[in-house]
């Protein structure tokens, strides 16, 4: 009763920070930070963004700093 087996296709993930050629993540760069936030306002997971552990940590800290300064919303009310 087993279904057909699927072949796994290994695609190389594109790291958004590397494609933009940014040395450091800045909390003032809201256009870049919005790529890592869901439409609900949550920080996207590392497995979704494709970032390394260090880069994900830098992005998360930058998003939190931008939220503190009201550059980014804490949560969205989109329904």
Swiss-Prot record:
Annotated disulfide bonds: none
GO molecular function, one term: structural constituent of ribosome
Keywords: Ribonucleoprotein, Ribosomal protein, RNA-binding, rRNA-binding
InterPro entries assigned to the protein according to its UniProt record, in alphabetical order: Ribosomal_bS18, Ribosomal_bS18_CS, Ribosomal_bS18_sf
Swiss-Prot/TrEMBL GO biological process terms: translation
GO cellular component: cytosolic small ribosomal subunit
tRNA processing in keyword set: no
Similarity-based family: Belongs to the bacterial ribosomal protein bS18 family.
Functional summary from the UniProt entry: Binds as a heterodimer with protein bS6 to the central domain of the 16S rRNA, where it helps stabilize the platform of the 30S subunit.
PANTHER family linked to this entry: 30S RIBOSOMAL PROTEIN S18, SMALL RIBOSOMAL SUBUNIT PROTEIN BS18M
NCBIfam families per record: S18 (TIGR00165)
Subunit structure: Part of the 30S ribosomal subunit. Forms a tight heterodimer with protein bS6.
Name of the molecule in the record: Small ribosomal subunit protein bS18
Organism: Cutibacterium acnes (strain DSM 16379 / KPA171202)
Gene: rpsR
């Amino acid at each position: 009763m087993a279904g057909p087996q699927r072949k796994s296709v290994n695609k190389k993930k594109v790291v958004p920070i590397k494609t933009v050629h940014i040395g450091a993540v800045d909390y003032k760069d809201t256009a870049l930070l919005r790529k890592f936030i869901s439409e609900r306002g949550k920080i996207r997971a590392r497995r979704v963004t494709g970032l390394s552990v260090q880069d994900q940590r830098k992005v998360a800290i930058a998003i939190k700093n931008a939220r503190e300064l009201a550059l980014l919303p804490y949560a969205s009310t989109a329904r």
